[in-house]
């Protein structure tokens, strides 16, 4: 049903966002250590 599809999409989006956040976080940490 529609609910299942929505849940599936929400999970995919959450995973993608988490990946992006991890990348940004890693960049931030590296930049901080470079200072």
Swiss-Prot record:
It comes from the Eukaryota. This is Cupiennin-1a. It is found in: Secreted. One of its GO terms (molecular function) is toxin activity. GO terms for biological process: defense response to bacterium; killing of cells of another organism. One of its GO terms (cellular component) is extracellular region. Expressed by the venom gland. Transmembrane segments: none annotated. Monomer. Interacts with CSTX-1 (AC P81694), CSTX-9 (AC P58604), and CSTX-13 (AC P83919). Belongs to the cationic peptide 04 (cupiennin) family. 01 subfamily. Pfam families: Cu. The keyword Manganese does not apply. The modification Glutamic acid 1-amide is found at residue 35. Keywords: Amidation, Antibiotic, Antimicrobial, Cytolysis, Hemolysis, Neurotoxin, Secreted, Toxin. It comes from Cupiennius salei. Has antimicrobial activity against B.subtilis, E.coli, E.faecalis, P.denitrificans, P.aeruginosa, P.putida, S.aureus, and S.epidermidis. Shows insecticidal and hemolytic activities. Probably acts by disturbing membrane function with its amphipathic structure. Synergistically increases the insecticidal activity of CSTX-1 (AC P81694), CSTX-9 (AC P58604), and CSTX-13 (AC P83919) by up to 65%. Also inhibits the formation of nitric oxide by neuronal nitric oxide synthase.
């Amino acid at each position: 049903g529609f609910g299942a599809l929505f849940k599936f999409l929400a999970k995919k989006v959450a995973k993608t966002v988490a990946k992006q956040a991890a990348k940004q976080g890693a960049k931030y940490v590296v930049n901080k250590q470079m200072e």
